[in-house]
């Protein structure tokens, strides 16, 4: 056998393209093909794991719909309300609004919360303002004073530091002396606007069942029509609430706190050890620990709280990094604690580790990116690797349909949603790896930018000559590189292939280029 390392084989052309071709051929059989076959096997296993999980959740939802019995419907809400009104024993409720430089939306949440129809002497509004802008801090405090003059018990709290970020603010808020008499705490992010009857539709569950530690409401998106990116986000989040959260609640297994639009029993927070800032998903961290202490949760899908989706691609990327990195990091930190916990049944612990964390927070991201964006395109240019259509086409198609049925009004956007989610899987995969390895960006906390009415005001105003779009800030090299790779594979399949994968590859390459050049979402002039 010719020594490819120390001897120069005869007949090797001298130009660079021929050298690259020779190098490719020399490693193709001994290295590329075995590695690609292994990757296909691993990705196929992950696809089947995700498929089984999605089908199982779909079966639960089907049973729930057929029987018309969701977890919260076993309670008679109207009867519980009447019982509370007759007794006049209204519990003291703390309402926390954490915010950080939320100049576009701070009035929305403060105004909505102060307008809640609960006895005025039985709730405290706590505005936790970590803003670093002194002018904005003054504006927020003035807004609080306005509602104080109207008779609402509002407490404005501003820290000199941002230790612990949101978790730190919530923790310090609960330590205030005036909170000692509060039994429950409702939490709303700065862009959330609860309806006036929110407390009437959530607190009775906690009063009726002393084992309940959390009542989680659903999100309702006020700006889903703003651009195509917000419509596609709506599809993903609708699946999360209508399927993942509902299944966790209906099966008494586990579902995570969404960080906002929920009401906690303060004793449950104390039993769990309080808020911790060890990850960027302090809400999920608290929910897992409370669940391990035996507290139950209920998801009330009929209660919807208006809020805003991130409409700029930059803001959405930062949000998805936090939402993907944090769970992976928490999974690493809590696996041993979950396994060793004897207070909850073994089946619930297995569900928490395998289904909730491993499949939904790790496998779902990895299989989407590695299989659909790396391995399948590679199989096109290495036809020696057998890729079964059941794995490459039928299983992904079934998973996609199960995801999309939760938002029927957007079914016509299904293809765009697939392409969009595949591109975002690049960032989610990278973030999950960072979380597992605890790399340098593992605790990166960037508040998701919300535009509120800002874009309406900008659209109505005459654009300034000084306003410019910074092209360089809109270019994302990783997306462009993956797009070029998929375009190369698509071209090869178009010229030499026979499986017609080039149709998918061209569309997906176009999606990577579109997002790589920042041509998605709302573009805000600088």
Curated annotation (Swiss-Prot):
- Which Gene3D superfamilies is this protein grouped with? Spore Coat Polysaccharide Biosynthesis Protein SpsA, Chain A
Segments crossing the lipid bilayer: 31-51, 362-382, 399-419, 477-497, 501-521
Entry GO MF terms? glucomannan 4-beta-mannosyltransferase activity; mannan synthase activity
**Transmembrane helix in keyword set:** yes
Q: Name one GO biological process term.
A: cell wall organization
UniProt cross-references to SUPFAM superfamilies, sorted A to Z: Nucleotide-diphospho-sugar transferases (SSF53448)
Compartment annotation: Golgi apparatus membrane
| EC id | 2.4.1.32
Q: Which UniProt keywords apply?
A: Cell wall biogenesis/degradation, Glycosyltransferase, Golgi apparatus, Membrane, Transferase, Transmembrane, Transmembrane helix
Active site per the UniProt annotation:
130, 283
One GO cellular component term of this record is:
Golgi membrane
Which top-rank group of organisms is this from?
Eukaryota
Keyword presence, Ribosomal protein:
no
Reaction(s) catalysed by this chain, per the record, are: GDP-mannose + (glucomannan)n = GDP + (glucomannan)n+1
Signal peptide range in chain numbering: none
Report the biotech usage. Answer: Guar gum also called guaran is a galactomannan extracted from guar seed endosperm. Gums are most commonly used as food additives to provide stiffness and texture, prevent ice crystal formation, maintain crispiness, and retain moisture. They have many other non-food applications such as dying and printing aids in the textile industry, thickeners for shampoos and conditioners, binders and hardeners for paper, rheological facilitators for concrete, and drilling agents for oil and gas wells.
Binding sites annotated in the UniProt record for substrate: 189, 191
Topology of the protein relative to the lipid bilayer? Multi-pass membrane protein
| Main localization (coarse) | Golgi
Q: What does this protein do?
A: Possesses 4-beta-mannosyltransferase activity on mannan using GDP-mannose. The beta-1,4-mannan product is the backbone for galactomannan synthesis by galactomannan galactosyltransferase. The galactomannan is a hemicellulosic storage polysaccharide accumulated in the form of secondary wall thickenings in the seed endosperm.
By sequence similarity, the record places it as follows:
Belongs to the glycosyltransferase 2 family. Plant cellulose synthase-like A subfamily.
The miscellaneous remark of the record is: Galactomannan is accumulated only in the endosperm and constitutes more than 90% of this tissue at maturity. Galactomannan is made by the combined actions of two enzymes: mannan synthase (ManS), which makes beta-1,4-linked mannan backbone, and alpha-galactosyltransferase, which adds galactosyl residues to the mannan backbone. The mannose/galactose ratio of guar galactomannan is 2. The degree of galactosyl substitution on the mannan backbone determines the quality of galactomannan as a gum. A mannose/galactose ratio of 4 provides a gum of higher quality than a ratio of 2.
Q: What is the official name of this protein in its record? A: Glucomannan 4-beta-mannosyltransferase 1
> To which species is this protein native?
Cyamopsis tetragonoloba
